[in-house]
Design a protein with these regions (language model features):
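Selective transmembrane-helix segments that form parts of the transport pathway or gating/packing helices
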Residues: 37, 41, 45, 84, ...
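Hydrophobic alpha-helical transmembrane segments that constitute the membrane-spanning cores
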Residues: 47-50, 54, 90, 130-159, ...
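Active-site cofactor/substrate anionic-group-binding motifs, chiefly glycine-
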Residues: 36-88, 92
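Cytosolic juxtamembrane amphipathic/interface segments immediately preceding
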Residues: 19-38, 179
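Membrane-interfacial helix-loop-helix connectors in multipass membrane proteins
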Residues: 58-81, 150-193, 201-221, 242-247
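Hydrophobic alpha-helical transmembrane segments of multi-pass membrane transport proteins
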Residues: 72-115, 202
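Short, membrane-interfacial amphipathic segments enriched in basic
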Residues: 1-27, 206-207, 211
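Short cytoplasmic-facing helical segments at TM-TM junctions of multi-pass membrane proteins
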Residues: 105-130, 214-217
Length: 247
C-alpha cells in the first residue's frame, strides 16, 4: 500500500513538473479532450437526468406532506452540486475513460512501444501521460457542471409532473436558486479537479506498470478502475471534511 501510494505520488509530481511543456502537446490534449467528451457526454446526460429525478421523487412527497415543498429544489440543487454530480461523473469517467487509458498504455507497454520511446529519447510521461491528464482536468469539471444543470432539470420535471409533489417549474427553480450559492458550485468543481487528477494518474500508472502478455492488460484495466473508484471515495470524504471545517 505504501509502495503503491509512493508510485502514484511520484508519477503525479513528475507530471506536474512536465506541465510547462503542455503547449507543445496542445493538439494531443485537444484530441484527447474531444474523445473523452464524445464518449461521456450522452451517458452523463442520461445518468444526471435520472439522478435528479430520483432525488425529487424520493424526497418530494415526504417534504410536501410536511409543508416543506420549498426544500425540494434546495435538496436537489445542493445534492447535485456538492456530492452526486462530482462523484458520479468521476466514477463514470474512471470506468469509461480511465479504463481506455490503461488499456491503451498497457498495450503499448506489452508490445514494447514505451521502450521504443525511451530509445528515441522521448519521455513517455511528457508524451503520453501529460496530454491525457490535462485532457481529463479539462473534461471532468465541464462534465460535472453539465451534470449539475441536467440533474436540476430532472428534479424539476419530476416535481412538476408528479401529482404528489405538484410544484411548478417556476416555484421549483425559484426555491433552488434561493438555496444555492456560488460557493456550493465551487465546491463541486473543486472536487472534480481533484478527482480528475486522481483518475488520470492512477489510470496512466496502471497502464505503464503492465507486465506480461496481452492477458495482463485486462488485469491492469480492472485494477485501474477499482483503485480509481476507491481513491475517489476516500478523497471525497477528505475534501468534504476540509470544506466543512472551512465553513
Amino acid at each position: 500500500m505504501i509502495r503503491y501510494t509512493s508510485e502514484i505520488v511520484s508519477l503525479g509530481l513528475e507530471t506536474l513538473r512536465a506541465w510547462p511543456e503542455i503547449w507543445h502537446h496542445r493538439r494531443k490534449v485537444i484530441q484527447c479532450f474531444y474523445d473523452m467528451a464524445n464518449a461521456s457526454l450522452l451517458m452523463s446526460c442520461v445518468l444526471s437526468l435520472f439522478i435528479g429525478g430520483v432525488l425529487a421523487l424520493q424526497s418530494g412527497p415526504v417534504l410536501v406532506e410536511r409543508g416543506l415543498s420549498f426544500v425540494v429544489g434546495q435538496l436537489v440543487g445542493l445534492s447535485m452540486c456538492k456530492e452526486l454530480a462530482p462523484v458520479m461523473m468521476a466514477i463514470l469517467m474512471a470506468g469509461r475513460i480511465g479504463s481506455a487509458i490503461t488499456a491503451e498504455l498497457g498495450s503499448m507497454k506489452v508490445y514494447q512501444e514505451i521502450d521504443a520511446l525511451w530509445t528515441m529519447k522521448i519521455n513517455p510521461i511528457h508524451y503520453l501521460v501529460l496530454p491525457r491528464v490535462a485532457a481529463i482536468l479539462c473534461a471532468l469539471p465541464l462534465l460535472v457542471l453539465f451534470s449539475i444543470l441536467v440533474g436540476w432539470m430532472g428534479g424539476g420535471l419530476v416535481s412538476w409532473l408528479n401529482q404528489e409533489i405538484g410544484l411548478s417549474l417556476q416555484a421549483y427553480f425559484s426555491h433552488l436558486k434561493a438555496g444555492i450559492s456560488l460557493q456550493d458550485l465551487a465546491q463541486g468543481i473543486t472536487k472534480s479537479i481533484f478527482f480528475a487528477m486522481l483518475i488520470g494518474i492512477v489510470s496512466c500508472h496502471h497502464g505503464l506498470q503492465t507486465k506480461g502478455g496481452p492477458r495482463s492488460i485486462g488485469r491492469s484495466v480492472t485494477q485501474s478502475v477499482v483503485q480509481s473508484i476507491v481513491c475517489i471515495l476516500i478523497s471525497d470524504y477528505a475534501i468534504t471534511r476540509i470544506f466543512v471545517w472551512i465553513e
